[in-house]
Amino acid sequence: YAGITIDFEGLKGDTIKQNYVTFLKELDAALPQGKTLYVCVQPDTWYTGFDYRGIGEAADKVILMAHDYQWTSVPDSYAGTTNTDSPVTPFASVYEALRDLTDPATGVADRSKLALQISFGSAGFHVDGEDRLLETTIYHPAPSTLALRLAQPDTQVVYSEEFRNPCALYTTEDGSRYKVWYENEQSVLDKVALARMFGITGVSLWRIGNIPADGAYDVWSALLTQR
């Protein structure tokens, strides 16, 4: 093996923050020579148990998981409304996460260690012809399913300049209409450019076998242009 990747999520509080860095430094010291230590971190807006500066000192690579911002539930009061703004990676939130990770006082000091993780989650809603919510269930179509829907001639794709995320409107075989937020070539390249603005040139992809590379939905080829 080449090394270890640590992905502990949901960490909160000063005690955990201190103990986690101690654990990582001890782990790094225990690894055989030449083995790498990668550490995944979450945005500290909600998860306060990540000491970015300390983690950066212990790790060979720090991977920022600034994704999956979509809703986890929908209030019943939203049914019948057009409130479906649930982008998976709203640009302002990703910006805030990158800013905090690279903060001169508390962030990772060596920016060459940093990578922005790109994930390919989705958030879909069952809507009527006026885009009103018919139910409060959130659907999560896989990239392979989205590729098929995006290839349909009647599918509409709208790119939100506010969120820098696309949403697709499509109809299934039974006549049901869905609105789905997801990642596409443009949204991924926008985040790559944003990361570069902070001096971050590394990208991490979640996960192998889940990266869209279809004719109508080809993020992989777009990423290769940034090498």
Tell me the role of every PLM-derived stretch.
Residues 13-146:
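Substrate-binding surface in catalytic domains of secreted glycosidases
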Residues 113, 120-193, 220, 224-227:
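Glycan-binding loop/region signatures in secreted carbohydrate-active enzymes
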Residues 3-10:
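Short acidic, glycine-rich surface-loop motifs adjacent to enzyme active sites
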Residues 15-16, 20-22, 33-35, 212-227:
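Short acidic, glycine/proline-enriched helix-loop-strand junctions
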Residues 2, 60, 201:
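Receiver (REC) domain switch/active-site residues of two-component response regulators
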